[in-house]
Amino acid sequence: SEKVMNHLGDYDVIVIGAGHAGIEAAHAAATLGAKTAVFTMSLDAIGNMPCNPSIGGTAKGTLVRELDALGGVMGLAADATYLQSRMLNKGKGPAVHALRVQTDRKRYHEYMKHALELTPGLAIHQAEVVGIEVENGHVKGVVTQLNGEYSAKCVVIATGTNLGGKIFVGDAWYASGPDGMHAANALTESLKAAGLPLRRFKTGTPARVHRRSIDFSKLECQPGDPDSELQPFSFLTDAPMHNKVECWIAYTNPETHRIILDNIQRSPLYGGMIEGVGPRYCPSIEDKVVRFAGKDRHPIFVEPCGENTEEMYLQGASSSLPEDVQNAFYRSIQGFEHIEIMRPAYAIEYDCVDPTSLEATLESKVVRGLYGAGQFNGTSGYEEAAAQGLLAGLNAARSAKGGSQLILERQTSYLGTLVDDLVTKGVMDPYRMMTSRSEYRLTLRQDNADQRLTPIGREYGLVQDDRWAKYQHTQSILEAERRRLHETHLRTADLRAAMEAAGLTPAAEGGIAEELLRRPEISYPLLAGVIGWGEGITPMLAERLETEIKYAGYIARQDRMIRDVARHEKTLIPADFEYADLTGLTLEAREKLTGIRPKNLGQAGRIPGVSPSDVAQLSIALTVREKT
């Protein structure tokens, strides 16, 4: 007999899924005044971290800052629930500095659930969405497993790895989402019927082990940064920060690798059971051992999952090998001899859309009013998901209410770069944001995300009064200090005394503070020792000012390089060009260029995995070849 549908509600925007993408989409849409509902299979899985218990990292930390600058929630949640904070890549230039925190999984979920509950105009429903309703090429609503029908002007799909989810551990497999959630199979069929081009991707996660079973005396300790140096993600966070836990590093060894290789055919990855494509930049431990056969060891980062749990996460050791093999190879590692696995490592295969079927607004070209975000769009990572969620939710709300939609250009943000890569190049494997993907990375730093994006967030209605006031206050402090540095002259004697006191060779002459700050050996704190700290200037703002002044010339040069690349787009590439000899290219670019053999630079730049900086390297090599 035909199902009788019960009409249960009318909304402007419906969001399917309440993971990292769904949270930001629902929050953004409701904040813009759209009547919004978010559907999740379980209220207890809102903001769940089924993989690493951390936020941020290289390029990802910048995405979180950008999200925050636009009015998102992730930065505030990370600041409220972190256990340990570290600034990565501090020994490198400011373009790649990256904030990363260990978070308390349970507290993060609780924070996010409460944040959604406190969002005005947002309804939260625990129900599985089994289908979308489409009429004349436009989405009209959703249907739930309980025969509930909800109409909507726009729908955002943020299903994570639940869509057609299938978990593999050795030769055992079962239909499932992450962390024991059930798979969303009916929705896959509905989306296929609507004409969406779906494909299969795969990801994996390591085992969770019991703290008491680890001998930490055999591991390297990895403390967080000194409390005095800790920085928040959110531009709104003012509270002092303190590290609460330590992380640790263990290493695989030749015996670990032997056990893995002896059992490699028992991995569903190598036994042909998994058809989905895995993430290039987050390989399983068996992938690492096979692909990097010359390496004697690989690091495994041992990270706590929370303050009130004994579960430890083994970052860098994801696997889909059977449990007996997992026990054997983990126990071959120093410090893990008596390891107790609480949750085995597994691989998960899932359905996602070909992102070239999306507009730059993240709206589907196939079904109007339907938006995609997160792993559904072919990306990997909480931060990539959250950033897309905000953009999709914002645009869904604007569309539902008849407003113009937001397209972020590459030069504005990592989020703009990510979306442009997705919809222009497409993806062959789960996409991870990296600094090398942006040709504007000197200007797209984590410290100036507010300057780049908060005015845009304000214009589109996401940035509320408190954030706008804080932003304007920060800008006025920075402008006043730039003026002061431009107008203040340091006497040679004062400067030399300050340099001597700092243990530096006092070779510099005095001069205008701004000009002196361009010199590599002179820092803002050193100058401030002579002329005093500017009013309202914190160590974070001082670092930002110093970067902008020191790197002004490099930024101008980078802009010229980008223009040169554009001019050379019609340059032909010889058919016999040896990409393997071009060490400036990333390994991924070399592989894909060799495989596809593009005819010209323009074609090369459109190949997934070939970044604009790879194109620049190629352009230089072709120019050199032409001259020789």
Show where each model-derived region lies:
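An anion/pyrophosphate-binding glycine-rich loop and adjacent beta-alpha core
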Residues: S42-D44, K60, M87, T188-N327, ...
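Internal hydrophobic alpha-helix adjacent to the cofactor/substrate pocket in enzyme cavities
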Residues: A385-L406
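Core beta-strand elements of the Rossmann-like FAD/NAD(P) dinucleotide-binding domain
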Residues: G9, Q145-C154
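Extended, charge-enriched "interface" segments that sit outside catalytic cores
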Residues: R437, T443-R445, A449, T454-A616, ...
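Beta1/beta-strand and adjacent pyrophosphate-binding region of the FAD-binding site
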Residues: H7-A21
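Glycine-/small-residue-rich beta->alpha transition segments that form the dinucleotide
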Residues: C154, T159-L163, L321, Q334
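Conserved N-terminal/central alpha/beta ligand/cofactor-binding core
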Residues: A25-E135, L146, A158-A175, H182-L187, ...
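A glycine-rich dinucleotide-binding beta-alpha-beta segment and adjacent secondary-structure elements
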Residues: Y313-T379, I407-D420, T538-K592, R597
